[in-house]
Every structure is written in structure tokens, then in C-alpha cells.
């Protein structure tokens, strides 16, 4: 029969002469390898592709349906001339590698006590429920070809198609080279033992070493129902009985263990014409049996006899299957589910096996231990591209797609900052905003949701782990204690403060690529527009200001920007010396802010504006001084960004109560331009606000929010949730993670992907007391 022909063809290609392994190297069934990651296994070639997880479990019903159909389309696209193996790999995190990549090294700069506290928090997180396991996903394609060139051409074509289909699912697929592919097996066989050296195929060949020496364990023992790898225990199981209806969460639940394990789904697709012919023949047989039974009943004068239930059911199911194949774009497939798990002791192994069996029974399925086939089972479940277990089950595309390998998206970027734990998988969320297309960020949440704490935690991580500069616009005086504890400078800007910022400070590095004086002249024009009212400075007055600005800075520039910069008082006196009456009018209009009671920006700077961490505390500015104060502060921030860029240094800018900035045209326009330009200058901006609805009244702010690659959404009010759902395309299920949730919990949107998260920080630490805004917990000095 045709299907038997398909199976026999596959069995013939997979058949190998059995030889008893004389060493652990012989027990590895890979015969040859190539630098691009292709294996020769038996008489066939295999290649593995990795793919990332997607947010399936928290998606809405409609989104789940769309993902399911896209995944079914991927399965339909599999070539019937090859076999596919989809593998989920629970890999233990290597503690030494983790510490090297994430823990903060000591610097002996007076901040090491904070680094120790931060590292203790990270270590307590990684040893939590599931954080010690990373889940990887692979699809291995195996095909029989005459030589490596034909195989390489085939994998190139199939790989492009596969990666395209994965992209439709928002999953990123990539080919694995030989080092990446062999690393999978080394991690499995040797646990999380770090490699003394990276695998180098060329070097191994030159020395005459086998690649198997690098990845194989010291010993392998196979028993009736388990095996041993060095001092670890393992067991292979397979899915023996399938329920009539399987939930799409079964595979995710089977893999939801804090253990090293692999689960593989082998798929062998049948050509549609052969499948239809076989089902038609089967239906013909069923109809013949029914007709014969009816004829016998008629011969016995039993004309009212009803066809037996099992025969009627067989006819119905066969017709449905034929309809699936001919009208519903389904393909017939053979499937096999195998699973291997490892443990440190036999008792733990038996306990884990029972957990797996119980999970399968919950879904009305039966997982069984392979008896006397542990070696064949291991070769089948590992992503070599082999299938040595014959327990195949006939499935359609839909019934295969139910075994969906997706659960929850993970964000774990090397060299990034810790932002919390994935609320679904409990794994760490680590993001490097510098690697995003646009690393700018918003933190949105109602009062008490934890947005300030979240920003402070990010500031702490940046301050303790990098040499980047941090500038904070602080309208509510919330960041001062933390900044001072980290060795930074708090600049309190107000009419009554002893702290002064000279609005006319300028050095060689001022401004962008143009002449510093041209940039400063533009700034002073903007400043006077704020002083006398936007649109009230005439063209004649602008010319006078430009001339006077040059006169005031002439001597300072001749001295190569050395000495003290001029102040607004110098500009005021220069205006009074001009012959035009408009000049005296400008001087009179600006008198309140230069020689009057609001003259804080007309005096020489008396604070350290070169400190690595600066908080500009503008809480006491007042309505009269706010426009000019905002202008001077933002000018100082932007020029610090430019200066750092010229030095090759990264600058992080944080703006609290971001909605306040959009009450003033200049500050709104400044941040909009900064949002678009700062990436060019090695900078990143973060806006914090609780008044989302007020912020979104500005079209500019909406555009900035929609174009931000990194968002942290905490607990939201009902109206804000509706606004954000429409703007950011957040599903109802995802909205539940920002509805009446605890402080520090919510959603992270990173590069278009939305992940629920939770974040808590140990309360019995000095860092917590510096970061919290609760009055009874705040530490007023460190």
C-alpha cells in the first residue's frame, strides 16, 4: 500500500547495521561533520535550526488561533522527502558563566557594598523556581542525499523557507554552525561543566583528534529502564497512547520542570496523493464491510437492523479524515513524541518520572518508559536527526500542531540589565537597551505601582556596572538620596537656592558639529523668547541679541574657552550699551531674571556639572521660573550628551513626571527632537509618568511612545489601559497583567514583544531603602 511504501522507504533509509559500541565515542551516532553544521548520520544528512519562543500561553483566543494556524502552515510546508524533529531542550544554567555575564565585579570605588547587595539579589533570583533552566528550541531536518553538495543545496532551500515561516510566527530562526550544534550535545552529556576551550574543527583536524572527544561523557551505562552518564541518571520515555482530544498546553506542561531534559516530536509527512489513495481504499473497505453486514441482515429478514456503532463510527471517522485531506488543506503525518530527563540520583529520577507520567495522565495520555531500548530512545530524542523507535502515530496537520512547542517568550540578552522575572516561566529578564534599534523607554503606571523604584533599580545597575553617565530630571525630589549615595551631584534649581547654573556656560565641545557660538546664540534667542513671550522677539531684536552675544563671548573665545564664562548679567550690560532703543527694551524685559529676584541663572555656576551622575532637582522652580529653568536645564543635559558622544561615552537620561514637560512648548519640542536624535549620540532617554491619559493628549507624546522599543507598563487605571491597549496592540489576556497587580509587576514591551514580568527587591538592604519612596522605609543617607 502507498503509506506502507512511505514508511518502508523511511525505514530503509534509517536502517543501519548494528555494532556493539566499544567506547563512549562509538555510542555517539554521528559519522561525519562539516563546518556549516551538517551531520552525516547513517546514510543520511541532518541540519539543525534554532528558533525562539513566542508568547503563546498569554495570547488572546483570536491570537492563539492565528498562531496555531501559522504553525500548522509551517508543518504543511515540511517536505515529504525528509523527516523533521522538533526539540525542546531544558538546559541548566552554568553558575560560573552566569556569574561572569551578569554579576557585578568589584571596583574598590567605595560602592562595593552596594554591588554585593545587588549580586546577592541576582543570585537569589537565579536559584529560584525555574531560573536555573534555560529552554532552547530546535528543528532538525534529515534527508537522504547522494553527497554533501546535494545535501547542502537542499538545506539551503529548506532553511530559507523554514526561517520565513517561523518569522510569520514572530519567532526568530537561525542555522546552527558546527560549534553551536555540538555544544547542544556537550551540554547534555557533560552537564553544565564549562569547556576548557571552544570547539575548533580546524584545530581538531590538524591534531588528529575526534570531535567526539570534546562532547562525549566519561562513561555511559544503559540498563533496562534507565541509563547513566558519568554520575548522573537518565531515562527515556515515549508517548504511547494519545487522547481523542489533547490540549495545546500539554507539551509546555511536560517541559515545565526545573530539570535537564529534552522532548522531541518526530514528524514524517506523507505525500497527499498517497494519503488520499490510502484513505479512499480504507473507506471502500469500510463500505464493503457495511454492505456485507446489511446483506446478511436482509437475508435473515432483519430489514430494520441498524449498523453497529463501531462500524458506523469507523465510516464516519474515515470520511472525516478524507474530507480533511481533500477539502481542509490537511496533510497526513506520522508522529512520535519522545522525552529524556536527567537527575542527580535514582530516587530523584524515579520521582521526576512519576511527575511526567502524572502530567500525561492529566491530559488523558499515557507516557511509557522504554524497556531495553534506552540507547535507541536516547539516539531518537537527541537532535542528531535519527529515529530508532517505531511507535509512530498517524496524525493530521491539526492534530500534530496541537503538540505546539511554544509557551512564553524569553528576553535574555548578554551584557544587559536585569529587569525582573518572566511571570509565566519565572526566568530572568535581561535586556541590553543599547542593542535595540531605538533604546528609548517609557515607564508608565499609577502612583504606587513601582515605576520610580524600577527606574532607580536601572540607575543602580548602570552606575555599578558601567562607566556611563546618568542625568536625571527630577521634578519631585525623588532621586536625590540615591544619587548622593552613588557619589553623584544633586543640583537643586530654584529662585531661593544657593545652587546656581550659569545659563551662558559654554566650552569647546558645546553643541553639535557646528561653531559653538552659533549654537549658543540660538539658545540665547530661545531663552529671550521665554523671557519676553514666544513670538514677541522681532527680527531687529534678534539681530541685536546675536551681535551682543558675540561681543560678550569674544574675549572668552580668544582665551580658548579658558577662565570664567560670561553670565546673563554681562549680556544685560552689553544690551544697555547698544544705541538702539530695542536693546534697552530687551534689557528691561529680562531684568526680573537677570538682576531681579529670579536671577539664579544669571550667576556663575557653583556646583559640579561634570559629575558622572547628576540629578537636576527642579521641584522648587515655581511657575514664573519654570520655562527659563527648564530651558537652561535641558540645554545642560543635551550638551552633556554631546560632550560624552565626542568622548565615546554613553549617556542615560531619565525624566520623571514626563507629562509635565508637555505643558511647555519648548520642553515638549526638545524631548521630541532628543527622542529622535539621541541614539546618534550614544544616548538613551527614559520617561516616567503616572498621568498616561494627560500625556497621550499630545500627538507628539503618542508618537514617541509608539516608537519606543522598550516600555515598562505597571499597574494602570481603567482609562489608561484602554488607551494603551489601542496604541500598543495589547490583548485582553495581556491587560490582566497591568490590572490591579502588585507594585513591581506588569508588562515589558521589548522590540515589539510583550512579556509579563514581576520584580521584587529584598527589603532588608541599604539599596532598597535608597530606592523606595515609602516614607517609613526611605534611607536619608548612606
What do these predicted regions represent?
Residues 54, 61-80, 87-91, 255, ...:
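P-loop NTPase motor domains
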Residues 487-491, 700-713:
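A short helix-turn-beta junction within AAA+ P-loop NTPase domains corresponding to the substrate/partner-engaging
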